[in-house]
Amino acid sequence: MPIRVVCLAVACAAVSVLPVRAHHSHTNYDISTWTTMEGTVVEVHRLVPHSWLYVEIKDAKGQTATWALEATGPGGLEKVGVKVNDVRPGDSIKVRCHLLKDGATGCLLGFVTPMHGDAARGHGIERDWDGGGGAGFPATGRFAEPAAR
């Protein structure tokens, strides 16, 4: 009996040090198609596990809606060079993202291009806000030019 207890304790200890990682899928997004949009940032939330941009975007009829744009977390953004002040509320931005399949005003961010005019904060430089390996993207961080929708 004592050998079983020792073996069980060793097995439990070995399993407990394995990295634990859980994540939801991105099946609610249409990752087969890119959409390009422009708007004004309302809020920026750099949270774990996902950061969020809330952006006012006008549709073809001129109606404005607030869109929720899901990005990678702060660590992933930092890893690919996105700085805290690159995008702030009130900034104009252009995004490329994957829309929600249900038609709601939200998308999975791929890229953000700040259009605020401040070169020190990356004006006109497109940055990867998915962290270089998320939903539908190759792990290398190299991306094919998407087709606009």
Protein language model features and the residues they cover:
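PEST-like low-complexity, intrinsically disordered acidic/proline/serine-rich tracts
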Residues: 27-52, 56-149
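N-terminal secretory signal peptides that target proteins for export/translocation
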Residues: 1-2
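Sec/Tat signal peptide C-region and signal peptidase I cleavage site
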Residues: 18-22
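Bacterial N-terminal signal peptides
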Residues: 5-17
